[in-house]
Swiss-Prot record:
Main location: cytoplasm
Positions bound to substrate: 25, 52, 116, 140, 190
N6-(pyridoxal phosphate)lysine modification, residue list: 251
Residues reported in the UniProt entry to bind pyridoxal 5'-phosphate: 78, 115-116, 140, 190, 221, 248-250, 259
Protein name as annotated: LL-diaminopimelate aminotransferase
Signal peptide: none
InterPro entries found in the cross-reference section: Aminotransferase_I/II_large (IPR004839), LL-DAP_aminotransferase (IPR050881), NHTrfase_class1_PyrdxlP-BS (IPR004838), PyrdxlP-dep_Trfase (IPR015424), PyrdxlP-dep_Trfase_major (IPR015421), PyrdxlP-dep_Trfase_small (IPR015422)
Lineage: Archaea, Methanobacteriati, Methanobacteriota, Methanomada group, Methanococci
């Protein structure tokens, strides 16, 4: 007999149908395809270029700070909305790395237990039933999900190659603008790897003023850029009047499991975020925040990681070009975003990127992530594991990439 509890689930997560859906989502399909490929080719190495998680641990010096701070009696308790020492360090870091000036460490900065809850909480601060969030696609879905949970709707802004993967703000209709409260941006962008420009950020600021909305710029990959200097939305004139930027320690400092991020920018938005956060959590463990302070004081940790990804991405671009793909170095992140082929010379057909991605896993044992939201593309990550004797090894890195090249060049892909 079915439990009465089945009838109590909120509509936002499916109501009475919660847990009964038979839809198989993208990442579950990838997981199943990987399992099937391993069974079919048990002696063949599966090369995972789909996962978007750093391959290395946090720097040894960061771990040491955590250990030392964890031994201190004073650090045992709640931190609520964060230790002031971390808040004091954040503006110094943002000015040194990104040129952001005049950020108030008391009223314009708050830490978060990772960027995911930050995106969720800020959405709850502003969205009422009927409100609209402007959301770039493809992209990280948290803001869109929570907008819908609060009775709002999402207007998608496609990121197209012809526009350098920047949204066309001028194309948004007057009707949508009138109900919009949030413009969500993410640069450097996951999955496209695109970097925004100062010109675009200024357009976003002007757009926010003209339409009475806020900008949430998700800067999870902000410190991982190639070519140009890292760019912050908050470094643009008047940006602080309309929005906030969310920075994460996960990608820049190999601290995904540590769950530490911060929100910086407009005082009112930060205050609203802090009020909601205060009702959800009691702050990140103080020793983790102290380790975060050490990170911000040592940007050379990030530089070492950034250089590794740049080296790998450069090699991946060369390999993909040799296999027929139109691959280019990204502006930032650790991803390559390449157009999927429509088939192979020997007769295989791919209706979309998902079908190509499944082919790659099942036949070549190379895992990628497909995106069919705005064109047919696959994302390939440079954070694959390449260790030898417990250390990152360029020799092992080259072995893996040479194997990727061998498998890709065995096939003649057909492109539009």
């Amino acid at each position: 007999m079915e439990s009465y509890i089945q009838n109590l689930f909120a509509e936002r997560i499916g109501g009475k149908s919660f847990g009964k859906e038979d839809v198989i989502y993208k990442f579950e399909k990838i997981k199943r395809a990987k399992q099937a490929a391993k069974l079919k080719y048990p002696d063949m190495e599966l090369i995972d270029m789909g996962v978007g998680e750093p391959d290395e641990m946090a720097d040894e010096s960061v771990v040491e700070v955590l250990c030392e701070e964890a031994k201190k009696h004073v650090n045992r308790g709640y931190s609520d909305n964060g230790v002031q020492a971390l808040k004091d360090e954040i503006p110094i870091y943002l000015e040194k790395i990104f040129g952001v000036k005049d950020l108030d460490p008391v009223n314009e900065v708050v830490h978060s237990i990772g960027s995911k809850p930050a995106l969720a909480y800020i959405t709850s601060v502003f969205i009422n039933p009927g409100d609209v969030t402007l959301m770039t696609v493809p992209g990280y879905p948290v803001t869109a999900t929570h907008t819908k949970w609060y009775g709002g709707s999402v207007e998608t802004l496609p990121l197209l190659e012809k526009n350098n993967f920047l949204p066309e703000l001028d194309a948004i209709s007057k009707e949508v603008r009138e109900n919009a409260k949030i413009l969500y941006l993410n640069y450097p962008n996951n999955p496209t790897g695109a970097q925004a420009t100062k010109k675009f950020y200024k357009e976003a600021v002007d757009f926010a003023f003209e339409n009475d909305l806020i900008v949430i710029q998700d800067a999870a990959y902000a410190a991982l850029t190639y070519g140009d200097k890292p760019l912050s939305f908050l470094s643009v004139k008047d940006a602080k009047e309309v929005g906030v930027e969310i920075h994460s320690f996960s990608k820049a400092y190999n601290m995904t499991g540590w769950r530490l991020a911060f929100v910086a920018g407009n005082e009112l938005i930060v205050r609203g975020f802090a009020a909601v956060k205060d009702n959800y959590d009691s702050g990140q463990f103080i020793p983790i925040q102290k380790a975060g302070i050490h990170c911000l004081r040592h940007p050379e940790i990030t530089e070492k990681t950034r250089a590794k990804y740049e080296r790998r991405l450069s090699k991946m671009v060369k390999i993909l070009k040799e296999a027929g793909f139109n691959a280019k170095m990204p502006g930032g992140t650790f991803y390559l975003y390449v157009k999927a082929p429509i088939g192979t010379k020997d007769g295989a057909k791919f209706a979309n990127a998902e079908e190509f991605s499944q082919f790659m896993i099942k036949e070549k044992l190379i895992s990628t992530v497909p995106w069919d939201d705005a064109g047919n593309f696959v994302r390939m990550a440079a954070c694959f594991e390449a260790f030898k004797d417990g250390e990152i090894s360029i020799e092992e890195e080259d072995r893996i990439l040479n194997e990727v090249k061998r498998r890709l060049t065995e096939v003649e892909f057909v492109f539009e």
